A protein has these predicted regions:
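C-terminal regulatory/interaction module of P-loop NTP-utilizing enzymes
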Residues: 1-172
């Protein structure tokens, strides 16, 4: 690093590393999921000698992160609930990758869901206000089915018939 105005050169420590993150790998966003991102020019991209893709953590690591934020859920019952929450998240992630839904549940969302569960004491309501209400209305049935698979509990959104959804789509 050169500080021209001070006529000084700063040498980095031998262990110095610089990391950057990008949801679009510098390519910009045509999907609208990351509004406001810009494409990075090739000169800038060429300065990064290593580019790596990081996917979601294994379930047990995600569990550890959630429990670190919510130690009150460390009981066997709490861990069972968090495990099911992570299973719902994994279903949304797979559906997102397959193009079936446009909203994905991040580990941050799982933490928020667990925190809301502590507040509201209702797994379905906390799911709805944390994640389901953020989903496209036409995709809520699919997402509600993921919840039903993992918690064996029906949500009103999962009971909507495809006819109801198609009528809403036509009305818009």
């Amino acid at each position: 690093l050169t500080l021209l105005d001070q006529n000084q050169i700063i040498s980095p420590n031998k262990h110095f590393r610089l990391f950057a993150t990008s949801n679009t790998v510098g390519l910009g966003d045509t999907t609208g999921l990351y509004h406001g991102t810009q494409q990075i020019n090739q000169g800038q991209m060429d300065r990064w000698s290593i580019v790596s893709t990081l996917n979601y953590l294994p379930n047990d690591h995600e569990m550890d992160i959630v429990l670190s934020k919510l130690p009150s859920m460390s009981s066997n019952e709490g861990k069972k609930i968090i495990s099911r929450m992570i299973a719902v998240a994994e279903l949304t992630r797979n559906a997102f990758v397959n193009g079936d839904i446009s909203t994905v549940m991040s580990p941050r969302t799982v933490i928020n869901w667990a925190q809301n569960l502590e507040i509201f004491k209702d797994i379905a309501f906390s799911f709805r206000v944390t994640f389901l209400n953020k989903c496209d209305e036409l995709e809520r049935t699919t997402v509600a089915e993921f919840f039903q698979r993992c918690f064996d509990q029906e949500l009103p959104e999962s009971l909507m018939s495809s006819t109801d959804i198609n009528s809403k789509a036509k009305d818009e």
